[in-house]
Amino acid sequence: MSTLAKIEALLFVAGEDGIRVRQLAELLSLPPTGIQQSLGKLAQKYEKDPDSSLALIETSGAYRLVTKPQFAEILKEYSKAPINQSLSRAALETLSIIAYKQPITRIEIDAIRGVNSSGALAKLQAFDLIKEDGKKEVLGRPNLYVTTDYFLDYMGINHLEELPVIDELEIQAQESQLFGERIEEDENQ
């Protein structure tokens, strides 16, 4: 497996939060200068490939994959599709997690779902069902996600407290099913 492929995979998983050279260097046990060179090669690869819709950008020291500007129109059209037909199971799972556990980071959502949620988050933001609401005060300062007023309107409620109450044990059981694990309840309960 090449260094470029490893970096590309980490950039994909990092999603819109991006990943810093220092983090890549630590994860891949490579010097930062080698990571910088590889990032340059990857950026050139995307730039030169007419069959790729991706580009590599750096913002505030974090690198992330984005779509090339010439794809903006088609992506805008895609995001205009009716919500009822366009929210995948992954997007609905992600929206439910945010609704009940907000504010929450993408990494925390990924931990619950067991898979990367960047695509689902982007779609939910495009539909204005969620928004970024500050940064978590931890290493890397990841974005915090919350639901929007439009989400409340869409759900037909005025406050989050009006969401159906879900038993915490039920949530844990559902989370465990996502991971393929089983929760064994205590016989005394």
UniProtKB/Swiss-Prot annotation:
Xref: SUPFAM superfamilies: Winged helix' DNA-binding domain
Keywords: Cell cycle, Cell division, Chromosome partition, Cytoplasm
Domain of life of the native organism: Bacteria
Subcellular location: Cytoplasm
Entry's Gene Ontology BP terms: cell division; chromosome separation; DNA replication
Primary location: cytoplasm
Alphabetical list of Gene3D superfamilies matching this protein: Winged helix-like DNA-binding domain superfamily/Winged helix DNA-binding domain (1.10.10.10)
This protein's GO CC annotations: cytoplasm
NCBIfam families assigned: SMC-Scp complex subunit ScpB
Similarity comment: family membership: Belongs to the ScpB family.
Assembly description: Homodimer. Homodimerization may be required to stabilize the binding of ScpA to the Smc head domains. Component of a cohesin-like complex composed of ScpA, ScpB and the Smc homodimer, in which ScpA and ScpB bind to the head domain of Smc. The presence of the three proteins is required for the association of the complex with DNA.
The protein's role, per its UniProt record: Participates in chromosomal partition during cell division. May act via the formation of a condensin-like complex containing Smc and ScpA that pull DNA away from mid-cell into both cell halves.
Name assigned to this protein: Segregation and condensation protein B
Chain's gene name: scpB
